[in-house]
Swiss-Prot record:
Origin organism lineage: Bacteria, Pseudomonadati, Pseudomonadota, Gammaproteobacteria, Enterobacterales
Membrane topology qualifier: Peripheral membrane protein
Protein name, entry field: Phosphatidylserine decarboxylase proenzyme
PANTHER family: PHOSPHATIDYLSERINE DECARBOXYLASE, PHOSPHATIDYLSERINE DECARBOXYLASE PROENZYME, MITOCHONDRIAL
Marked site: Cleavage (non-hydrolytic): G253, S254
Catalytic function, reaction form: a 1,2-diacyl-sn-glycero-3-phospho-L-serine + H(+) = a 1,2-diacyl-sn-glycero-3-phosphoethanolamine + CO2
Gene: psd
Transmembrane segments: none
Pfam families: PS_Dcarbxylase (PF02666)
Keyword Cytoplasm in record: no
Keyword Lipid metabolism: yes
A biological process from GO: phosphatidylethanolamine biosynthetic process
Length: 322
């Protein structure tokens, strides 16, 4: 009965307005009130502040600043084996496995379309048919920056407007085509393991989705698909990111979906639905054994995130540690 009520609310509540209100409130400096809200959040969700670079909740000027708090480097060591791809986010695996032609498993008994997830881009979908996918759910208590599973050259980014359903286990099991319906940002990379897509999926009360190379992608929510492309390799204007490097962030919890080309990687055998994930731990292994040459990432813009002009720089959070 309770679950039915929660699902009904997903269709009844004005999700867009709730999301806008949450984003507005989370960006405001409110002194002692901000600290009180953060303290209550930490207590309710059992957030481990010992992992944060700034464990004192009084050091965060807004709730958003707290929510995208950087972690200390040593708490998420990155597996250095060049044949291993690592987990991109802290959270829980919702589903994982093989993409069956155009079908991706959402929950037991529920599939959705690969092509629909990629906003009807059949050329991009062709890269991943019969490939491998991993869906990672980030709960409110989790660290909300998203990192690279491997070295990658950014080739394309697509913003897809959509619904703002919650993306927890209840909705995944009951809302058809959930991830192909919700707002999302699709990032396509060239990697040594073939093409890889990393998709940041929005949800109710997710105030914004951001990337390190472009800042805030949403809001504004203009209701139209937007597409950007970048040159390959070492060409001028290319964006290269290293394994374990931050690539984006959410303000409030959501989901990351990774797509890998067929025959390129094998998922770690121990992983299954509801497995806990930590950034830097093994996610998959290359089907070929090789040694990756050292690479340096292209410099990223030092601009600050548009949604918060006083936020830490996108590339290096250590510069203003206290």
């Amino acid at each position: 009965m309770l679950n039915s009520f929660k699902l009904s609310l997903q269709y009844i509540l004005p999700k867009l307005w709730l999301t806008r209100l949450a984003g507005w409130g989370a960006s405001k400096r409110a002194g002692w009130l901000t600290k009180l809200v953060i303290d209550l959040f930490v207590k309710y969700y059992k957030v481990d502040m010992k992992e944060a670079q700034k464990p004192d909740t009084a050091s965060y000027r807004t709730f958003n600043e707290f929510f995208v708090r950087p972690l200390r480097d040593e708490v998420r060591p990155i597996d250095t084996d060049p044949n291993v791809l690592v987990m991109p986010a802290d959270g829980v695996i919702s589903q994982l496995g093989k993409i069956e032609e155009d079908k991706i498993l959402q929950a037991k008994g529920h599939n959705y379309s690969l092509e629909a997830l990629l906003a009807g881009n059949y050329l991009m979908a062709d890269l991943f048919r019969n490939g491998t996918f991993v869906t990672t759910y980030l709960s409110p208590r989790d660290y909300h920056r998203v990192h690279m599973p491997c070295n990658g050259i950014l080739r394309e980014m697509i913003y897809v407007p959509g619904d703002l359903f919650s993306v927890n286990h209840l909705t995944a099991q009951n809302v058809p085509n959930l991830f192909a319906r919700n707002e999302r940002v699709i990032c396509l990379f060239d990697t040594e393991f073939g093409p890889m897509a990393q998709i940041l999926v929005g949800a109710t009360i997710v105030g914004s989705i951001e990337t390190v190379w472009a800042g805030t992608i949403t809001p504004p929510r203009e209701g139209i698909i937007k597409r950007w492309t970048w040159p390959a390799g070492e060409n001028d204007g290319s964006v290269a990111l290293l394994k374990g490097q931050e690539m984006g962030r959410f303000k409030l919890g959501s989901t990351v979906i990774n797509l890998f080309a067929p025959g390129k990687v094998n998922l770690v055998e121990q992983l299954e639905s509801l497995s806990v994930t930590k950034i830097g731990q093994p996610l998959a292994v290359s089907t070929e054994t090789f040694v990756t040459p050292d690479a340096e990432p292209a410099p990223l813009p030092a601009e600050e995130i548009e949604a918060e002009h006083y936020a830490s720089p996108l590339v290096d959070d250590k510069k203003d540690q206290v």
